[in-house]
C-alpha cells in the first residue's frame, strides 16, 4: 500500500504520481483527483461455482484499471468512493507461471497485463475458485459460445493433499453440470516441449471426435464428448516447458496471472484450470477447429506446484479427481505418446464387452519417421523389432493367462472400480502409491528397486485382489506411437530402470504367488496363474545367467570350429582368432563393470559405442561358426549314409550340432515370421531382424551389467523441492457483510489484455524454438564419479556366472564327475538351445490361442 500523505488532511494518496497512459491510450497522465466513479456498469457474469453462487463481483466495488509500465513493481492503492464501495488500483509486475530454460523458445513474458482488476470473491467452501472469461480472440476461432463452459476458464487453487481433495469440498465443473464421466483420460508430463505435447493432445482429441462419430452406439454419439474428461497433470510449476504453456493458453485452457502461491496461509499444492476447448493444435502448430471435425473436449489442467514425480501425478488423477468424477474407465497416457485414431475406443470396448477386465493395454509402436528413415539407425531398428515381437508373442500369451506382467504406463487403461481399496484402505491403489514414499533412505534396497516398476506391482495386485476375479487383457487393435532412444547413452539409461524394476517386481510377484488363491478366481484360472509364475521364474533364472550363457555359446562355437573335418581357416588361425576375441571379451566385461560403478553412460558415450560395435562383430563371427559347423555336420551325416535316404535322415537327427541348431533356429526365427504373418504385421522381419540379431549381445552384456551395477540408483530427482514460492501472489480472506469469507484477487479481465495475451501465446508458437543445449550441473558431475558400491548383488551375480562358466569349460579333474569337456559342452549347449526352443514354442502357442479367443470373444 502507498503511505498516507499527511499534508492533505490524512487522506490516502499515493506518494508518487501514477504512470502515464499507455501509448495506445493517448492523453495526459492520471492524477488521483481525476478518478471518476460509476457503480452502474454491470460486472461480467461469472461461471457459477455452486448452485448457490459462490464467485462474483461485489456490487459495492468499483473496478478501475491501473495503467502500469513494464518496469513497475507490485503495489496498490485503495480509495473510498463515498458510497461504501472501494476502488483499488493495482500495479503488478507479473511473470510467466512456467519456468524452465531460457533457450527453449519465448513464452509470453512481456508485461501485457496493463489492466488488472481487483475482484472481491467469496471463497467456495473455504477454497479459492475463480471464473474468468476467455479471450475474445480465442472465441473468434471457435464455433460454440452458447454456454459458460466455452466462454469462461475456471481456476481452482488446491491447498491440500490429493487424498483430501474431496474432503476439502473441492468441486469440478462436471459435478456442477451434473455430468457422468465414462472415460477419464490422464496425460502426465514433466518438461516435454510443445511438439511432444501437441502430438499427444491432438491424438486424444481425434479419438474423442471418433467417439462422437459413432451414432449407433448406446454410449457415444454427437454428445459423447460430455462423457469424456481429459486431465493434464504437469509435474512441477517451474519445470513445465514454456512453449507447452503457450499451447495451453492458445487452446483457452490456461491464463497467466490467475494462479496464487498461498491461500489463507496455506501453500497451494496444485493449480487447476478447467475449460471446454474447441481448438486442437497439431505437432506442426496448425490450429484445427470445428471445420476439421474437432469436437469440444473437457480439459482439466492440473499444474502441480512442486516436482514430485509421476506417481504423485497419478495420485492427483486417481485420489483427487477420480472420486469426484467416478469414471468407468481410466486411460493413462504419457505426453509424447500418440494414440491411434480409434485406439481409445478399442481400449474402452475391452471393458464394455468383458465385465471381468480390470486393465488393458494396446501395442506400443516405435516412431520410425517419414518413410521409416529412423530404421537406418540400428539402435532404433533393434528396438522396433523388440517392441513388435513383444506385442505379437509376449503380450498375447500373458493375456491368455489373464495376467499381463506390466501394462505400460505410456498407454494403458484401468477399470476405476477394480482399482479401489477395501474399507480398511488396503488394495491395488494402496500398494501402487507406496512407490511415492520408496526413496532410498525410506525403504530397503529391494523394495526401492521394486517400485521402479510400480505399474508391475499394480498389475499383480489387481489380479490377486482379495475376493475379486479381475483379469488383464491385451487389445491388439489399440496402439500408441512413441519415440525410442536413438543414442547409446539414452538407451542404456532408460533400460537401467526398466531392467531393475522388472527384475525385482518379478521376484515380488513370485514370492507372493499364494495371494491369487485368496482371490475369487476359479481353480482353472489359479492353475493358469501358477503355470505363468513357473514360466516367469524360468525366464528370470535365464536372465540371471544370461551373460554366462552367451559367453559359453561364444566359447563353445569358436573352439569347435577347429575340430570340424573341413575347417574354414588355415592351421591354428581359428585358435588365434578365438584367443584374441576371448581376451577382448573378458577385458571389455571388466571395463564395463568399472565404468558402470562410477559413471553415467553420458560420460562414456564413445566407450559404450565401441563396446557395442565389438559385440556386433563378435555376434557375426559366432553366427559364421555356427553355420559352418552345422553345414559340415550335415555333409558328414550324408556321406555316412550315402545310399540310404532313411539312414541319411536318421543320421541327421542323430547329428547333435545339426539337430540342436535347426530346432533352435526354427523355434525362434521361423516362429517370428509365422506369428507376424498371422497378426498381419510381418514388415519388421525384413527391416529390423538383422539389426536386432547383431544388437542382441549388447542387450545381454551391456544393459545387464549397467543395470545390476546401478541397483543403488533409485532416486527420482526431487530432493530439496520443499520450499514455498510466493511469486504468484498471496490470497487472504476477510469477512463480508453477510459473514461469508471473501478474498480480493487481481485478475486480467479486460478483453484488450486477454486478447493481447492470447495473441502473444499464438505468436510464440510461430517462432521456431532455439535448440536446447543440455548441460550437466556440478552435482550431477559429482554423482557421476561418486556412487556407492553395491557389493552383495553384483558379487553374487558375477560369482554365480563365473561358477557356471568354470564348470563347463574348465578341464581340471575337479570337474570330471560332470564328464569331460566335450560332453559337458555338448550337453549344456543342447540344454540352452532346447530351452530357447521350448520358451519360444510356449509364446507361439499363446499367440495362436489369443487369436482364436479374439475371433470368438472380441
From Swiss-Prot:
Residues 1-15 have a biased composition (Low complexity). Belongs to the chitin synthase family. Residues 1-63 are annotated as: Disordered. CDD domains: Chitin_synth_C (cd04190). The chain crosses the membrane at residues 537-557, 576-596, 609-629, 661-680, 685-707, 791-811, 831-851. Its main location: membrane. GO terms for biological process: cell wall organization; chitin biosynthetic process. This is Chitin synthase 1. Its EC number is 2.4.1.16.
Amino acid at each position: 500500500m502507498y503511505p498516507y500523505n499527511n499534508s492533505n488532511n490524512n487522506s490516502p494518496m499515493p506518494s508518487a504520481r501514477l504512470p502515464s497512459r499507455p501509448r495506445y491510450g493517448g492523453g495526459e497522465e492520471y492524477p488521483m483527483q481525476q478518478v471518476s466513479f460509476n457503480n452502474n456498469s454491470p460486472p461480467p457474469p461469472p461461471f457459477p461455482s455452486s448452485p448457490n453462487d459462490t464467485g462474483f463481483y461485489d456490487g459495492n466495488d468499483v473496478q478501475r484499471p491501473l495503467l502500469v509500465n513494464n518496469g513497475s513493481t507490485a503495489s496498490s492503492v485503495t480509495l473510498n468512493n463515498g458510497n461504501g464501495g472501494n476502488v483499488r488500483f493495482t500495479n503488478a509486475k507479473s511473470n510467466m507461471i512456467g519456468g524452465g530454460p531460457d533457450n527453449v523458445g519465448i513464452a509470453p513474458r512481456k508485461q501485457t497485463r496493463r489492466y488488472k482488476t481487483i475482484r472481491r470473491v467469496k471463497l467456495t467452501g473455504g477454497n479459492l475458485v475463480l471464473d474468468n472469461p476467455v479471450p475474445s480472440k480465442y472465441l473468434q476461432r471457435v464455433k460454440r459460445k452458447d454456454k459458460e463452459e466455452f466462454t469462461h476458464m475456471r481456476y481452482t487453487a488446491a491447498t491440500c493433499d490429493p487424498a483430501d481433495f474431496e474432503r476439502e469440498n473441492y468441486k469440478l465443473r462436471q459435478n456442477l453440470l451434473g455430468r457422468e464421466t465414462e472415460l477419464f483420460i490422464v496425460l502426465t508430463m514433466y518438461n516435454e516441449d510443445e511438439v511432444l505435447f501437441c502430438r499427444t493432445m491432438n491424438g486424444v482429441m481425434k479419438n474423442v471426435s471418433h467417439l462422437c462419430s459413432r451414432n449407433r452406439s448406446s454410449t457415444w454419439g454427437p454428445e459423447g464428448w460430455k462423457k469424456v474428461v481429459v486431465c493434464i497433470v504437469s509435474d512441477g510449476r517451474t519445470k513445465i516447458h514454456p512453449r507447452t504453456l503457450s499451447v495451453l493458453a492458445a487452446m483457452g485452457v490456461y491464463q497467466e496471472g490467475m494462479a496464487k502461491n498461498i491461500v489463507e496461509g496455506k501453500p497451494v499444492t496444485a493449480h487447476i484450470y478447467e475449460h471446454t476447448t474447441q481448438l486442437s493444435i497439431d505437432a506442426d502448430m496448425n490450429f484445427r477447429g470445428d471445420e476439421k471435425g474437432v469436437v469440444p473436449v473437457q480439459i482439466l489442467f492440473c499444474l502441480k506446484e512442486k516436482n514430485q514425480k509421476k506417481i504423485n501425478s497419478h495420485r492427483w488423477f486417481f485420489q483427487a479427481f477420480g472420486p469426484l468424477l467416478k469414471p468407468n474407465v481410466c486411460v493413462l497416457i504419457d505426453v509424447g505418446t500418440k494414440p491411434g485414431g480409434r485406439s481409445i475406443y478399442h481400449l474402452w470396448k475391452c471393458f464394455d464387452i468383458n465385465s471381468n477386465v480390470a486393465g488393458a493395454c494396446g501395442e506400443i509402436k516405435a516412431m520410425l519417421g517419414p518413410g521409416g528413415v529412423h530404421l537406418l539407425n540400428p539402435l532404433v531398428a533393434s528396438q522396433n523389432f523388440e517392441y513388435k515381437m513383444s506385442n505379437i508373442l509376449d503380450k498375447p500369451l500373458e493375456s491368455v493367462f489373464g495376467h499381463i506382467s506390466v501394462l505400460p504406463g505410456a498407454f494403458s487403461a484401468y477399470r476405476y472400480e477394480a482399482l479401489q481399496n477395501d474399507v480398511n484402505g488396503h488394495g491395488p491403489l494402496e500398494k501402487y502409491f507406496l512407490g511415492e514414499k520408496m526413496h532410498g533412505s525410506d525403504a530397503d534396497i529391494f523394495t526401492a528397486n521394486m517400485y521402479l516398476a510400480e505399474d508391475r506391482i499394480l498389475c499383480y495386485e489387481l489380479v490377486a485382489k482379495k475376493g475379486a476375479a479381475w483379469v488383464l487383457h491385451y487389445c491388439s487393435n489399440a496402439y500408441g506411437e512413441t519415440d525410442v532412444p536413438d543414442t547409446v547413452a539414452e538407451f542404456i539409461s532408460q533400460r537401467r530402470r526398466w531392467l531393475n524394476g522388472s527384475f525385482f517386481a518379478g521376484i515380488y510377484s513370485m514370492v507372493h504367488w499364494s495371494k491369487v488363491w485368496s482371490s475369487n478366481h476359479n481353480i482353472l484360472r489359479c492353475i493358469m496363474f501358477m503355470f505363468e509364475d513357473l514360466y516367469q521364474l524360468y525366464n528370470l533364472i535365464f536372465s540371471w545367467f544370461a551373460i554366462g550363457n552367451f559367453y559359453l555359446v561364444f566359447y563353445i562355437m569358436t573352439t569347435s570350429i577347429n575340430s570340424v573335418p573341413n575347417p574354414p581357416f588355415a592351421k591354428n588361425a581359428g585358435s588365434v582368432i578365438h584367443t584374441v576375441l576371448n581376451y577382448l571379451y573378458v577385458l571389455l566385461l571388466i571395463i564395463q563393470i568399472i565404468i558402470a560403478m562410477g559413471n553415467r553412460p553420458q560420460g562414456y558415450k564413445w566407450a559404450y559405442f565401441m563396446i557395442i560395435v565389438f559385440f556386433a562383430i563378435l555376434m557375426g563371427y559366432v553366427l559364421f561358426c555356427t553355420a559352418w559347423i552345422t553345414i559340415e555336420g550335415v555333409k558328414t551325416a550324408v556321406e555316412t549314409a550315402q545310399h540310404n535316404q532313411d539312414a541319411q535322415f536318421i543320421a541327421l537327427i542323430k547329428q547333435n550340432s545339426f539337430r540342436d541348431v535347426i530346432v533352435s533356429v526354427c523355434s525362434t526365427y521361423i516362429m517370428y515370421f509365422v506369428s507376424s504373418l498371422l497378426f498381419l504385421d510381418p514388415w519388421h522381419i525384413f527391416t529390423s531382424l538383422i539389426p536386432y540379431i547383431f544388437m542382441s549381445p549388447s542387450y545381454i552384456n551391456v544393459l545387464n551389467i549397467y543395470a545390476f551395477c546401478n541397483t543403488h540408483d533409485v532416486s527420482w530427482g526431487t530432493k530439496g523441492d520443499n520450499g514455498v514460492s510466493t511469486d504468484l501472489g498471496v490470497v487472504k480472506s476477510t469477512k463480508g457483510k453477510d459473514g461469508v469469507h471473501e478474498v480480493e484477487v487481481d485478475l486480467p479481465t479486460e478483453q484488450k489484455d486477454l486478447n493481447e495475451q492470447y495473441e502473444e501465446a499464438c505468436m510464440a508458437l510461430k517462432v521456431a524454438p532455439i535448440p536446447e543445449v543440455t548441460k550437466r550441473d556440478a552435482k550431477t558431475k559429482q554423482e557421476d564419479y561418486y556412487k556407492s558400491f553395491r557389493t552383495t548383488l553384483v558379487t553374487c551375480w558375477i560369482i554365480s556366472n563365473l561358477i557356471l562358466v568354470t564348470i563347463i569349460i574348465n578341464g581340471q579333474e575337479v570337474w570330471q564327475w560332470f564328464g569331460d569337456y566335450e560332453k559337458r559342452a555338448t550337453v549344456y549347449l543342447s540344454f540352452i538351445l532346447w530351452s530357447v526352443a521350448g520358451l519360444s514354442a510356449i509364446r507361439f502357442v499363446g499367440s495362436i490361442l489369443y487369436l482364436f479367443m479374439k475371433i470368438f470373444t472380441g
